């Protein structure tokens, strides 16, 4: 180590853009027991800290480093003493702990993902302590806080896989010498929704209810009315319609990012077997797939 220090030479042509270190995928199952009625939150948490000095990078000096094993243990202890009311509140608790406990921590960033457990229910009666894994959209959040500022909270849903068998088409696109895709007025539309939004303020927000509301709005706009659906001329239009509906219904959010892969299902040609397949048997293709993204935010004038 001494030889390393003696051979160190500063490079004046380089500067740090951003640094961080931490612990990823710290898993916790928190059980809240109210008599025989139990509630659970299972989460996977990742923590990144930025320190005021760079001597660990520049000199191999570890004297300012909070070990990542300590970070893991801190997440466990905060779950015990603070509980997990919502993953957003848990993320804020973690940021605030490290910023208040260590003066040389200048930035804390926390990602929390909730494992989707749902309480068992039958005929309107909820089970007191049994749950079923229901992967119908994963709730996640990102919390970032600088020493000089309030926490910035993003929430989102991912892995929300949806499909409709009609009321979707794709026409009027550019055709050149490499185009083989035919226009279609009626097709299957399947996607796996990734949707993330930012809260413009964090006080008195019911994060759980807001997440549920936005998830329901995504499904509402994708599917349309239950008796007839709603036509989608493109994935892009559906994506934008989800954003417009969400920001109009949920005043707590400032912007929204959505990514929608276009998961393809193609009609299987059975003509060589003397059969006519009228879009009854389709072939799912995992890849390649189209990917449509978009982010919108409120204009400044709309907030005045």
From Swiss-Prot:
Keyword vocabulary terms for this entry: Acetylation, Oxidoreductase, Peroxisome, Phosphoprotein, Purine metabolism
EC number: 1.7.3.3
Motif (Microbody targeting signal): 302-304
Source organism (scientific name): Macaca mulatta
Modified residues (N6-succinyllysine): 10, 23, 221, 228
Keyword Acetylation: yes
InterPro entries tied to this protein: Uricase (IPR002042), Uricase_CS (IPR019842)
Pfam families: Uricase (PF01014)
Pathway: Purine metabolism; urate degradation; (S)-allantoin from urate: step 1/3
GO cellular component terms attached to this protein's record: peroxisome
Post-translational modification N6-acetyllysine, affected residues: 10, 23, 27, 36, 118, 122, 164, 175, 185, 221, 228, 278
Chain positions with N-acetylalanine modification: 2
UniProt-recorded name of the protein: Uricase
Residue list for modification Phosphoserine: 39, 63, 232
Gene Ontology terms for molecular function: urate oxidase activity
Transmembrane residue ranges: none
Record localization: Peroxisome
Keyword Cell wall biogenesis/degradation included in the entry's annotation: no
Positions of the catalytic residues: 23 (charge relay system), 68 (charge relay system), 264 (charge relay system)
Catalytic activity reported: urate + O2 + H2O = 5-hydroxyisourate + H2O2
Residues found modified as Phosphotyrosine: 289
Chain sites annotated for binding urate: 68-69, 170, 187, 235-236, 262
Cited function: Catalyzes the oxidation of uric acid to 5-hydroxyisourate, which is further processed to form (S)-allantoin.
GO biological process: purine nucleobase catabolic process; urate catabolic process
Record-stated family: Belongs to the uricase family.
Gene3D superfamilies: Urate Oxidase (3.10.270.10)
């Amino acid at each position: 180590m001494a030889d390393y220090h003696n051979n160190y030479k500063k490079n004046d042509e380089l500067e740090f853009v951003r640094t961080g270190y931490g612990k990823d995928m710290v898993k916790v199952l928190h059980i809240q027991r109210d008599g025989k009625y139990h509630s659970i939150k299972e989460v996977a948490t990742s923590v990144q800290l930025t320190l005021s000095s760079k001597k660990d990078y520049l000199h191999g000096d570890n004297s300012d480093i909070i070990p990542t094993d300590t970070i893991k243990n801190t997440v466990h202890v905060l779950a015990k003493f603070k509980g997990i009311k919502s993953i957003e509140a848990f993320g804020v608790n973690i940021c605030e702990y490290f910023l208040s406990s260590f003066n040389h921590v200048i930035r804390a960033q926390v990602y929390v993902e909730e494992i989707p457990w749902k309480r068992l229910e039958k005929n309107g009666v909820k089970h007191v302590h049994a749950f079923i894994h229901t992967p119908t959209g994963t709730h996640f959040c990102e919390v970032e806080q600088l020493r000089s500022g309030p926490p910035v909270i993003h929430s989102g849903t991912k892995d929300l896989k949806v499909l409709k068998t009609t009321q979707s088409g794709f026409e009027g696109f550019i055709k050149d010498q490499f185009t083989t895709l035919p226009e279609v007025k009626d097709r299957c539309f399947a996607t796996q929704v990734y949707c993330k939004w930012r809260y413009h303020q964090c006080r008195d927000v019911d994060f759980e209810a807001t997440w549920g509301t936005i998830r329901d709005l995504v499904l509402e706009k994708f599917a349309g009315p239950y008796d007839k659906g709603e036509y989608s001329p493109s994935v892009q239009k559906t994506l934008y319609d989800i954003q417009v509906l969400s920001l109009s219904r949920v005043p707590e959010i400032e912007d929204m990012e959505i990514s929608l892969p276009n998961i393809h299902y193609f009609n299987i040609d059975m003509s060589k077997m003397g059969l006519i397949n009228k879009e009854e048997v389709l072939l799912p293709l995992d890849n390649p797939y189209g990917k449509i993204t978009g982010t919108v935010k409120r204009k400044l004038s709309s907030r005045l």
